[in-house]
Amino acid sequence: MSFFADSVLMVISQLLFFGFGWLFFMRQLFKDYEVRQYVVQVVFSVTFAFSCTMFELIIFEILGLLNSSSRYFHWKLNLCVILLVLVFVVPFYIGYFVVSNIRLLHRQRLLFSCTIWLTFMYFFWKLGDPFPILSPKHGILSIEQLISRVGVIGVTLMALLSGFGAVNCPYTYMSYFLRNVTDADILALERRLLQTMDMIVSKKKRIAAVRRNMFQRGEEHSKPSGFWGMIKSVTSSAPVSENLYQIQQEVDALEELSRQLFLETADLHATKERIEYSKTFQGKYFNFLGYFFSIYCVWKIFMATINIVFDRVGKTDPVTRGIEITVNYLGIQFDVKFWSQHISFILVGIIIVTSIRGLLITLTKFFYAISSSKSSNVIVLLLAQIMGMYFVSSVLLIRMSMPLEYRTIITEVLGELQFNFYHRWFDVIFLVSALSSILFLYLAHKQAPEKHMAL
């Protein structure tokens, strides 16, 4: 294919990715909000399009599509654009919309937006000082300076999510961790909730009755006769006010208890549904996956520990290494190079699809959890920043899963980064995240029955 035809193919694919990002923005993130800033929508869609294009170019590297020079050009162009968006455009607009929400700074929002962006750039640049992420010969304006710093943030984010996911996935899927919940437990808790609601209604009726009596009494004594009449009205209303305050305090405490009882009741219903679901064929399948992921989690933690202790980074991609070990052990004739290419392609494809799907699901949940009509623009831009850094760092790590002959152009485009550092850093953060998640889930699982008994 000629360079022009290759470029047309890349532009068409980028337009498709842009359209998908636009639809995701409209139908998932902003479907419940009327006010939309089109610049936010464009920035999010552009970030999504160029992030997906990097994964597309990885697939093209393995399949050998497009000319080598075309792939190199589009790798370079794509990387420059995504870095420009992540380092300059998105941080500036985040500061701009933050300042726009502050009325006192509304007239000088451009000045304060630039100030926020310069502050971001200072800390972003200082981020590279403590890490051995660059070769000493790179200049201060080289593209490697930006990639290296974006990679540190992205790899840290990936490792945190991977560590928590490796622990939370088996905990969620396995029926072993489900506590036993009966209909009697649910009915008892619902009865307590109804009793609490009745007490709240009763006390609020008392408050309304006391206020009505105070209002009627106030009309009768609206014109107290003389000095002693005023003293009498003040002294008689003081105990009533104290009584009202005490009843209101009791109502507040009961409402807090009702919220806890409601959440606990909803949790028991969800657990009961999970128990029933675990008895179905699909539930048993996910239970099996839970055991598989448990083994995977233990293996990943073990290998991360080994890599950290012995300062070890694999030189061969995992697929080729695994096939070589199997072939040598069984002593059979096998074309390792041919099959490692195809299996690596399938593996990388699975990693790419699951990464994009998982990140989009996580972004949607996160957005609905913390967004509001005023903060939604800022939240979307933050998600675009996280998404772009996540995908750039994914390329740094996926590179190790590819056979050596497919890494050439990617390595040339990314520059002489210290790739081994990123893999070691991933192992360190993954280990910390996984162990912290195990401790957190253990405490939460242990506390749940105690909380249920207390309620």
From Swiss-Prot:
Glycosylated residues: list them. Answer: N67, N180
Q: Which GO terms describe its cellular component?
A: Golgi cisterna membrane; Golgi membrane; monoatomic ion channel complex
Membrane protein topology class:
Multi-pass membrane protein
> Would you kindly state one Gene Ontology biological process term found in this protein's UniProt entry?
intracellular pH reduction
Query: What's an example of a GO molecular-function annotation for this chain?
Result: voltage-gated monoatomic anion channel activity
Q: Where in the cell is it found?
A: Golgi apparatus membrane
User: Catalytic activity annotated for this protein?
Assistant: iodide(out) = iodide(in); chloride(in) = chloride(out); bromide(in) = bromide(out); fluoride(in) = fluoride(out)
- Name the domain of life: Eukaryota
Q: Which InterPro entries match?
A: ABA_GPCR_dom, Golgi_pH-regulator_cons_dom, GPHR/GTG
Ranges that cross the membrane: 5-25, 46-66, 79-99, 111-131, 150-170, 290-310, 343-363, 378-398, 425-445
A Pfam family annotated for this UniProt entry: GPHR_N
State the UniProt keywords alphabetically: Glycoprotein, Golgi apparatus, Ion channel, Ion transport, Membrane, Protein transport, Transmembrane, Transmembrane helix, Transport, Voltage-gated channel
Q: Does the keyword Methyltransferase apply?
A: no
What's this protein's family per the entry? Answer: Belongs to the Golgi pH regulator (TC 1.A.38) family.
Quote the function comment for this protein: Voltage-gated channel that enables the transfer of anions such as iodide, chloride, bromide and fluoride which may function in counter-ion conductance and participates in Golgi acidification.
Quaternary structure, from the entry: Homotrimer.
Tell me what this protein is called: Golgi pH regulator
